[in-house]
Swiss-Prot record:
Comp. bias regions, Basic and acidic residues: 153-167
Name used for this protein in its record: Alpha-crystallin A chain
Primary gene name: CRYAA
Presence of keyword Signal: no
Native source species: Aquarana catesbeiana
InterPro entries given in the database record: A-crystallin/Hsp20_dom, Alpha-crystallin/HSP_16, Alpha-crystallin/sHSP_animal, Alpha-crystallin_N, HSP20-like_chaperone
């Protein structure tokens, strides 16, 4: 069973009539006129309008999948290196924290920080959890589930983030 935190099609209640990138996870990449004035850009040039349904990985939305035998979290962290990321398990939650110091980009100087926390299934085998960062900046946290009669230990422990050389393909919905 796939569990999506927020499906891209139902991103905002007002759909294309609401500035849709203001609070997304694409900090520091600049804003366009259609981000602030969606009515103006669509009426002046309807053929130049920004796509209403951007790809999943371009939107900064995390994806949580929990099926019968595996639990997986995919998170777009393309602006962070493995050294900037901290992943740890604390009781029934996994906490993912990313922070990098101020650096220069195309628009000036920027520093980024985020903190995400996800509840883990009670039957997740915490001793077999892996966490990797793909070449295209997708952090994948995953682990197998145990038989329902067993219970995993709940304590605080860090999870190392390994670096993969190949990009992650976008997950299918």
């Amino acid at each position: 069973m796939d569990i999506a935190i927020q499906h891209p099609w139902f991103k905002r209640a007002l759909g294309p009539f609401y500035p849709n990138r203001l609070f997304d996870q694409v900090f520091g990449e600049g804003m366009f006129d259609y981000d602030l004035f969606p009515f103006l850009s669509s009426t002046v040039s309807p053929y130049y309008r920004h796509s209403l349904f951007r790809g999943f990985m371009d939107s900064g939305i995390s994806e949580v999948r929990s099926d019968r035998d595996r639990f997986t979290i995919n998170l777009d962290v393309k602006h962070f290196s493995p050294d900037d990321l901290t992943v740890k398990i604390l009781d029934d939650f996994v906490e993912i924290h990313g922070k990098h110091s101020e650096r220069q980009d195309d628009h000036g100087y920027i520093s980024r920080e985020f903190h995400r926390r996800y509840r883990l299934p009670s039957n997740l085998d915490q001793s077999s959890i892996s966490c990797s960062l793909s070449a295209d900046g997708i952090l994948t946290f995953s682990g197998p589930k145990m038989m329902s009669g067993l219970d995993s230990s709940h304590s605080e422990r860090p999870i190392p983030v390994s670096r993969e050389e190949k990009p992650t393909s976008a997950p299918s919905s």
